[in-house]
C-alpha cells in the first residue's frame, strides 16, 4: 500500500525483486530494487539507470514515479520497520534530494534536514505542541507584565499541551515545521544566514496560521472555524483581500466570498452541484462515479448550453460533446494513457507520436501537415 501526501492509499500486488507495477487509474509506477538493469522493453529502463547502483541492487528499497522522465521517490528505512518512508528523490538527470530524519528525541522519525544535488544543506526546525504551548505561555506572561506591549491574537489564545491523538484527517502527533534554514552552501561556505528562508506560525489547535518569507514579511494568512478543527474559513495573500468560506453541516463549502471579485454559492444535490455567482449566473455540474473516480459528465452553462463528457474505466477523458452536439473523441494508449489521436466532429483525425520515454515527438494534422520535436536525452 502506497500512501501519498494527497491522502491516497494505492494498493499494489506484492512485488518480486526488480519487478515494476503500474496503476492505470492513478498513473503511478511502483518498483522494487534488486536488479542492476531493467529489460529494454520496460518503459522505465532508462530512468532506472539514473539511480545509484546500491539503490538498484537492494531488494529492500521500493521506488515510485508518475513519469518516465522522473523523478523517482525512493522509499527506504533508517532501520528496518514494517513500513518504508521517503528517503531520497532522484530526478531524470540523477540529481537528488536526500532527506535526513531525527533518530531520537521528541521529533524522532521526522525530517529535520535536506541535502540537495548541489551539496546545499537545509535544516527543518520542528516543534511539538508542548513546546509551542510553553512558548505561548512565556509570551503571554511577558505581555501581561508589560501593559504597554501590544496584545496579539496568539498571546490571547490558550495553548493546550497536547492535541487530540486522532482527528477526522487522521492521527496527529503535534509536530509542526517552524522554519527552514539554509545551513551550508558550497558556493558560499563562509556565509551563515541570519534569518530563515521561511517561517511558519500555528494556532492553539495546531493549524497553520501564517507564512513569512526570508525578509520577515507575512505572505499567507489563514483563519479557522473554532468549532471544527482544521476547517479553514478564510485565507489571504500578502497585499490581497481576504477570501472567506461558509460550510453546511456536512462540511461542504456553501459560499465563497471574495471582496474584490465574484462571490459564489454552492448547492448540493444527488450527483449534482449548483454554482451561482454574485451576478446571478448559474451553472450545474452533474457527476458520476465514486471517490477518486468521480467525474463531471454533464455541465449546464449559465447561457443554457450543455456540454457532456465521457470517461473510461480509469477515469480518463475519452469524448466530449459540445452545446451544438459536436462530438470529439480522445483515444488513449491502453498502457500509458497517453493521447494517441483526437477524432474531430467532422471525422478528421489529429495523431500524436511518442518516443520510448513517452515524450511527444510528432503531431500529424488532418491536412497532412506534420510537426516534430527532438530531445537531447
Predicted regions and their residues:
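Extended charged/polar low-complexity repeat regions
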Residues: 1-377
Amino acid at each position: 500500500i502506497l500512501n501519498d501526501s494527497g491522502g491516497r492509499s494505492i494498493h499494489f500486488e506484492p512485488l518480486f525483486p526488480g519487478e515494476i507495477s503500474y496503476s492505470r487509474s492513478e498513473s503511478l509506477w511502483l518498483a522494487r530494487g534488486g536488479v542492476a538493469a531493467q529489460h529494454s522493453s520496460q518503459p522505465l529502463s532508462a530512468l532506472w539507470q539514473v539511480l545509484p547502483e546500491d539503490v538498484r541492487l537492494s531488494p529492500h528499497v521500493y521506488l515510485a514515479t508518475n513519469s518516465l522522465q522522473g523523478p523517482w521517490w525512493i522509499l527506504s528505512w533508517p532501520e528496518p520497520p514494517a513500513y518504508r518512508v521517503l528517503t531520497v528523490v532522484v530526478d531524470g538527470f540523477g540529481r537528488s534530494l536526500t532527506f535526513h530524519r531525527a533518530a531520537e528525541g521528541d521529533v524522532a522519525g521526522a525530517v529535520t534536514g535536506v541535502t540537495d544535488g548541489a551539496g546545499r544543506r537545509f535544516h527543518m526546525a520542528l516543534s511539538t505542541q508542548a513546546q509551542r504551548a510553553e512558548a505561548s505561555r512565556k509570551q503571554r506572561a511577558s505581555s501581561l507584565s508589560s501593559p504597554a506591549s501590544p496584545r496579539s491574537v496568539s498571546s490571547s489564545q490558550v495553548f493546550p499541551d497536547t492535541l487530540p491523538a486522532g482527528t477526522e484527517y487522521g492521527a496527529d502527533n503535534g509536530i509542526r515545521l517552524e522554519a527552514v534554514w539554509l545551513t551550508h552552501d558550497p558556493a558560499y561556505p563562509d556565509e551563515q544566514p541570519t534569518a530563515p528562508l521561511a517561517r511558519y506560525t500555528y494556532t492553539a489547535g495546531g493549524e497553520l496560521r501564517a507564512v513569512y518569507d526570508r525578509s520577515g514579511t507575512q505572505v499567507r494568512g489563514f483563519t479557522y472555524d473554532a468549532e471544527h478543527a482544521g476547517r479553514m474559513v478564510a485565507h489571504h495573500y500578502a497585499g490581497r483581500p481576504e477570501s472567506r468560506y461558509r460550510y453546511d453541516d456536512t462540511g461542504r463549502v456553501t459560499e465563497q466570498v471574495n471582496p474584490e471579485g465574484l462571490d459564489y454559492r454552492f448547492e448540493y444535490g444527488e450527483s449534482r452541484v449548483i454554482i451561482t455567482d454574485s451576478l446571478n449566473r448559474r451553472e450545474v455540474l452533474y457527476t458520476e462515479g465514486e471517490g477518486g473516480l468521480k467525474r463531471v459528465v454533464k455541465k449546464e452553462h449559465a447561457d443554457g448550453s450543455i456540454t457532456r463528457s465521457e470517461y473510461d474505466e480509469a477515469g480518463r477523458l475519452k469524448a466530449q460533446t459540445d452545446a451544438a452536439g459536436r462530438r470529439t473523441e480522445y483515444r488513449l494508449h491502453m498502457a500509458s494513457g497517453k493521447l494517441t489521436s483526437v477524432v474531430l466532429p467532422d471525422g478528421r483525425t489529429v495523431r500524436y507520436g511518442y518516443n520510448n520515454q513517452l515524450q511527444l515527438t510528432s503531431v500529424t494534422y488532418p491536412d497532412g501537415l506534420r510537426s516534430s520535436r527532438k530531445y537531447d536525452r
